[in-house]
Amino acid sequence: MKANQFGRKGWTPERIENLSRKTFVITGTTSGTGFEAAKILLSKGAKVTMLNRNPKKSENTIHTLKQVLGNDILVSAITMDLSSQASVKKAAELVIANESKIDALICNAAIAQVPKQTFTEDGWESQMGTNHYGNFTLQALLYPLIEKSNGRIVTVGSMGYNLGIKTIQFDDINWDKNYTANGMYSQSKLAQIMSVYELQNRLQAAGKTNVKAYACHPGASKTSLIKTSGSLMTRFIWQIMKLSPLVQSAEKGAYPQLMCATEPKLDQTGFYGPTKNLNTVGPVGAHKLEPHAKDRAVAKRLWDLSEKETGITWNL
């Protein structure tokens, strides 16, 4: 096994330097890893804009963060439903109006284990529409602000990418014929991860080496992801698992995305997360990504389909 480049303890937030005058945009911060990531960034002096679906929860989150860190922190929230292209576009417009640059966009929000096939208002299966198409559009629209600061795009994936079929099911993209909660979640996360490495290829081809794109995952962390969208049985099983040593804290689950957003000279070709117990817990660093997640032909086809479906073209 390859040694962790950050040593025996792996990467930790102690490596983050002062982030004053740095601006971060992060999705899904009202609980779990997103909340912990926002808290740590703010504690280092960063300015943080949170994109969340529920405005009341955003308000409560800001109140909590100020109680912990003080009233002088630079934190704000914009309402955004990642499953709605109209909402994503409106939120992006507000970010562009309020910010002159973005040092890192952290795409943390997701839904998982939706028990029955449901569709977004745009006509896509809900997990694919939220986790993939929603993030694809958000990243494309905010790319100009990220480019201004030679910034980063961080996609929070999942080891679930490797638990389903090993390609994109283009002939039935909404999984009308064989829908399962696990299979569709895996598909959406595979699509997210493939798009990161395809973006890297396109940035390189365009000579835009100043912008970096990273893929990471939180491992098995104590979050509310399954609680908000999984079936009753899935939620019950997860509550039991959270009591075991196979699951780590939400704070530790936030380390991979924080590393990808802040660590200088981090190799963007890596895949980052916990490195023990099948990459579910343990020291954070780079670990193996299965070859099918970097299948260039499939990734290119997915990218072209995503531009067609969303009507969004990246301005590279």
PLM regions with names:
Residues 50, 80, 245, 291-294:
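Pocket-edge positions in alpha/beta enzyme catalytic cores
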